Amino acid sequence: SGSGDSRILIIEDTNGDGRADSRKVFAEGIAFPSALAVGFGGVFVGAPPNLLFIPDRDGDDVAEMDDIEVRLTGWGIRDRHETINSFHWGPDGWLYGLEGFATPSKIRRPIGKGKIYKHNEPFPEDLLEADGIDINGGVWKYHPTKDRFEAVAHGFSNPWGIDYNSKGQLFISACVIPHLFHVVPGGIYHRQGGQHFNSYIYDDIKTIVDHRHRSAHGGARIYMSDAFPPMQNNRIFMANIHEHAVLSDILVSRGSGFVAKHGEDFMMANNAQWIGFSLEIG
């Protein structure tokens, strides 16, 4: 929000009827919050060019705004719908996230305490001039106590949505190009455009899907619970903004990887104004 009205809210359903009963403002005024993950006594927030940690050490559900930490910096914003997104805790204890192919970034620790940008402040023009780890489309991870950042895989389009299956295999959903990928650390994957950093790549890793939907998917979540019928277990669910729907694919092991086959459309909205893009499993 360029107006300064961005808020991080805590919404609670206290009686389990599927409707929100309370609403609290955890923090407001953070410029362009694009990703959230709760942990370690606070909230990790993607607010390009920064990865912020906003503490709540007393547990009162109110951010301690004077103690915000800039953990990392260098994320680009050339294409706002491809910047830092989709935070998710991995089974290894690292914080995972995504970035799209049209927003070059160079990730590093900030100088000193770093700079927390305010709404309408100019974005730094020297973003790509410092030393750091290059990423321009891909999966990355950050260790919250060791303060380490690594690029996990490169490529894709503007991926949104990341999850693991019960055996720790990593999957992401993507837009425009085929919508689902099985991610292996170190992998170089199909790009929507541009060049790979490694000029010696003779081919890249392709999608695992054997079908197509309309173009923009996000919010990948693998269902591993018992509230739905058994046939839904271990399926991967994704929102699709152009179909105004929640779709599902069936993950089938094949060789050292997977094939994603078309599952039933889980939910088709009856109102075109509904555009889902983030899913969570309770």
What are these regions (language model features)?
Residues 1-282:
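Beta-propeller domains with acidic blade repeats across secreted/periplasmic ectodomains
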